[in-house]
């Protein structure tokens, strides 16, 4: 890992480390050596939860404590942190042991998410709380811009699952239909299928999860459009059937 590549990561974080050793430790998985990032991850997790809680408190004045807690949980969960790692292109900076490298650990959401928290902890130790808060706010601004308080920050896959379960329909099926590019920068294409509604959506993503989320988002929009149309068609069919059944009675009355 070169100083130049670390400088690129620092630019993406918008923080220059006074102690470069902290940055290197934050990027080091336990499989790589004894000086790994788990303690930094523990610290970063606490700082992250506080900063996100403050952001939500200021942004959503009408949400109660329960909704704020659920929204925060969705924003700091593994999947959300892995998305931030993707934006930082963090996989190319990870320091992994040989076994983790061979098994594709640089793409594993749990490792990516833990490293993001470790980076937040490293910034806190390097320059204090305000620096860590600034870095976290910067990384969460794109996330917060798309948060719908009505759905409490749930991702597209969760919303699609709840939508289908609420209508007693089978859960969607996700299938990787194609991969492109080198191992460290693969692009995925994933199909989201809802057989009961005859919906099939294929979407790309920088990771399998990202592609699944993109496909689920479009599939949810399609399902929301299909079901009202299907209900309207059924109602229309029932109305025609009722009219047909009542027609002979009306004719008989006119004959009389």
UniProtKB/Swiss-Prot annotation:
Class of the enzyme per the UniProt entry, highest EC level: hydrolase
Write out the catalysed reaction: Endonucleolytic cleavage to 5'-phosphomonoester
- Does the record's keyword annotation contain RNA-binding? yes
Q: Which GO terms describe its cellular component?
A: cytoplasm
- Where along this sequence does the record place binding of Mg(2+)? 41, 114, 117
Domain DRBM residue range list? 155-225
* Name the UniProt record assigns to this protein: Ribonuclease 3
Q: Which organism is it from?
A: Bordetella pertussis (strain Tohama I / ATCC BAA-589 / NCTC 13251)
Organism ancestry: Bacteria, Pseudomonadati, Pseudomonadota, Betaproteobacteria, Burkholderiales
Name of the gene this protein is made from: rnc
